[in-house]
Structures are given as C-alpha cells and as structure tokens.
Regions:
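Conserved, structured core segments of small domains
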Residues: 1-91
Length: 91
C-alpha cells in the first residue's frame, strides 16, 4: 500500500540545542534505515519550511503508524497521511 505522507517539524521554543541536534542525528539514521528497507520510497524537502513530502510503501495502516512513530522527531511533527490508489490513466 502506498501512502503520501506530509511531515512538518515544529521545534518547541526553549528546547535544548544539544537535544535537538541529537534528535536530528537519530532521525537521519532512522530515515536511512527505512529507505534502505524499501518502506520509505521517496523523500522530498519542502522549500522554505522544516517539512518533507514522502511516499511510503507498507502492508497496512498499522505498519505505517508504527514506522512513523519510530522516528525520533515524531513527537515534534504534524503529520498528514493520504492513502494512494493507482490512477486508471496510469501507463
């Protein structure tokens, strides 16, 4: 199942710069693991925002939730998920 996932990171005022940097390092590693496993198919940065647009390929809604909640920055994110289906005009 393919999903369009839009993630926006909201950095809380007053967060320790060291904690945020550590979370970013861990986030990058986890994102790499999910891409290498084939679950995180595409990842694009949104210009001018601390956000991304991604395509995930997973077996279920529950699996997607598990993967997204495993991201170290998950507690700081607003996430919008859209399930995708093949378009009848696709060639």
């Amino acid at each position: 199942m393919l999903y369009l996932v839009e993630m926006t990171v909201n950095v809380p005022h007053g967060i320790s710069p060291e904690l945020l940097e550590q979370m970013k390092i861990e986030e990058k590693q986890r994102a790499k693991e999910l891409q290498e496993s084939g679950h995180w198919k595409h990842l694009w940065r949104v210009v001018g925002r601390y956000a991304n647009v991604s395509i995930f390929d997973v077996d279920s809604h529950d699996e997607l939730h598990t993967l997204l909640s495993s991201l170290p920055l998950f507690p700081l994110m607003d996430i919008r998920v859209t399930a995708l289906a093949k378009h009848p005009s696709t060639i």
